[in-house]
Amino acid sequence: MDSENTFKNYFDLNPSLILNFSGPNSILKRSYIKYSEDLRSLTVRYELSLFPDFISLFFSHEKPYKAFYPLVNSDVDKTDYTGVVIYVGDVYNNTFGSKKLEDSFFIKIYDENIRPYFDKRMVSSEALKKWGMLEYSNDVLYSNKNRVGYRPLKLVAKSIYGKNNTDIILDEYSINKLFSNSNNIKLLQDGKLVIIK
């Protein structure tokens, strides 16, 4: 789910979440029923809509949180980007061995001093319900222009972070480029973020 919690952690912390998967108000929708020829067994398939039904269980804000943006920087990039693409495809080494970025519904972006700059609370609830905080891709030439448009800001991660290896560390140049422009912050709030793995 995110850098601190798996699905199991969320359900352990809030056991009432399970109620959303049963009963008349279940977010699971029955999509297929088939009886065996001898009527001794029944196959039932359920569908779960990740957006908006499932994802809405894991955030509570209505408006995006805005802490300190935009950064004040004399070298502000005034380019009008249409999305943000961050390449995080490398294997990163540290004292505990090598690690690769793990997929997650919610990520955080940190600077090299592990100061947090971005998390799910900073994304609008409308964007989270529409398509989530971000999209992952293995395609370096990512082509979903609906998400990031034709002129995305392209950055390369310095490293990854978090208990579950889901968060991104950007160098100072990238942090300044991303967070010194209010248009870029709006792109993040709108979920126009793609991570290339």
Q: Which residue ranges define each predicted feature?
A:
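Domain-level marker for long, solvent-exposed, non-transmembrane regions
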Residues: 1-197
